[in-house]
Amino acid sequence: MPDMLTLWTDIKALFEENNSKTAYATWIETAKPIALDGNKLTLELPSPLHRDYWTHQHLDQQLVEYAYQAAHEDIQPVLILENERQQQATLKAKTAPVAAGEPVEPTPTFMKETALNSRYTFDTFVIGKGNQMAHAAALVVSEEPGVMYNPLFFYGGVGLGKTHLMHAIGNKMLEDRPDTKVKYVTSEAFTNDFINAIQTRTQEQFRQEYRNVDLLLVDDIQFFANKEGTQEEFFHTFNALYDDGKQIVLTSDRLPNEIPKLQDRLVSRFAWGLSVDITPPDLETRIAILRNKADADQIDIPDDTLSYIAGQIDSNVRELEGALARVQAYSQLMHQPIATDLAAEALKSLNLANASDAVTIPVIQDRVAKYFDVSLKDLKGKKRKKAIVMPRQIAMYLSRELTEASLPRIGNEFGGKDHTTVIHAYDKITESLKTDPQLQKDIDSLKDDLRR
């Protein structure tokens, strides 16, 4: 096992890669490693607010997964505040060691019950244009599991509400039918459980744990990529549940057919139900999300300040809520009421001013249209002239390369075209770049222009 600082550095790198800049700067970078005792990593957090966030947003569970990726060790986090250090030391001193020679029965980690986040409900979910279809489908599944949309597959960028809806389904089913057996797990946790079952020779218990449920929720299944053994096991788990009429809900950052090295038979089964795209919230929805969060956390904040924060961040809900929490923490530290000026000061170090300059599909369309001297109407239209088709394909290629938009969303921005059209355009440009130096020059010029 690596030493504490090396382990924490590796874990932080994975946190930074998989979380927004705001969330990382506010919640992860402020954590301080204190001790690595066996498989327990003690982290000191600066405030109770931070510890609540780590728990409610499942950062502790993410840490377990990232530690396994970094060191192939089952590391469990212990979250303490600075004034609890002495209490932690006392507790450690009172812990009696296991008697020498006494056999310890290995307990597979998958036997531990996975709890849903009680705060993730349909009541606390803010509906907007980008998620209303996903919300409607989730509600249907929670009321009639295993009937209409099975599996239900949510896909979209980080922090847009996929996990919230997944938990909301589980919470609603448990509210309506308390005897419902619900299992929520991330794909990495599923993989770790599977590996643990092999190592402890408890494969049968593993299968009972995952197949004897009424609702299986699996988050971030894109991490099944390149894991042949895990995919094989999940294939049989999926079949067992589906054949028994049990509901399956999955999330990913992309469509199943876009996940590299995902078995065709899994791609096919994931398509049996309904796949729903969740897109970033518009301004009105972002303001509503912030107001909802402020009311839930009893934060006294003016409407104009909420509008200011919503105007600064347009990427995802997680980053929005992270910004609000940062403003709240800054207000408490400065002993000042929250106002727009204070919010601007609190968010200044995040360089959010650059967020408005981020590359978007409309910006790409505008630059490509001007570069090739075609109209936006033609670029997004159906004309098949070569002088228009090539710029259109280049714009689709750049949209795929420079934004996090899904294939259906890109197609929608180009006059409602099917996602297969986007795939064809991307593949066409990718192939042409290998033999066409002028095309390479055009692409490079456009990329330079878009990144300035």
Curated annotation (Swiss-Prot):
Region of interest called Domain III, AAA+ region, as start-end residue ranges on this chain: 115-331
CC annotations in GO: cytoplasm; plasma membrane
InterPro entries: AAA+_ATPase, Chromosome_initiator_DnaA, Chromosome_initiator_DnaA-like, Chromosome_initiator_DnaA_CS, DnaA_C, DnaA_dom, DnaA_N_dom, DnaA_N_sf
Chain positions covered by the region annotation Domain II: 72-114
Region feature Domain I, interacts with DnaA modulators, mapped onto this chain: 1-72
Sequence positions that bind ATP: G159, G161, K162, T163
CDD domains in the record: AAA (cd00009), Bac_DnaA_C (cd06571)
GO terms classed as biological process: DNA replication initiation; regulation of DNA replication
Subcellular location: Cytoplasm
GO molecular function: ATP binding; ATP hydrolysis activity; DNA replication origin binding; lipid binding
Region annotated Domain IV, binds dsDNA, chain positions: 332-452
Alphabetical list of PROSITE patterns matching this protein: DNAA
Chief place where the protein resides: cytoplasm
Swiss-Prot/TrEMBL keywords: ATP-binding, Cytoplasm, DNA replication, DNA-binding, Lipid-binding, Nucleotide-binding
Entry-linked SUPFAM superfamilies: P-loop containing nucleoside triphosphate hydrolases, TrpR-like
Binding partners and assembly: Oligomerizes as a right-handed, spiral filament on DNA at oriC.
HAMAP family for this protein: DnaA_bact
Family, per entry: Belongs to the DnaA family.
Record text about domains: Domain I is involved in oligomerization and binding regulators, domain II is flexibile and of varying length in different bacteria, domain III forms the AAA+ region, while domain IV binds dsDNA.
Function, as annotated: Plays an essential role in the initiation and regulation of chromosomal replication. ATP-DnaA binds to the origin of replication (oriC) to initiate formation of the DNA replication initiation complex once per cell cycle. Binds the DnaA box (a 9 base pair repeat at the origin) and separates the double-stranded (ds)DNA. Forms a right-handed helical filament on oriC DNA; dsDNA binds to the exterior of the filament while single-stranded (ss)DNA is stabiized in the filament's interior.
Record's protein name: Chromosomal replication initiator protein DnaA
Record organism: Levilactobacillus brevis (strain ATCC 367 / BCRC 12310 / CIP 105137 / JCM 1170 / LMG 11437 / NCIMB 947 / NCTC 947)
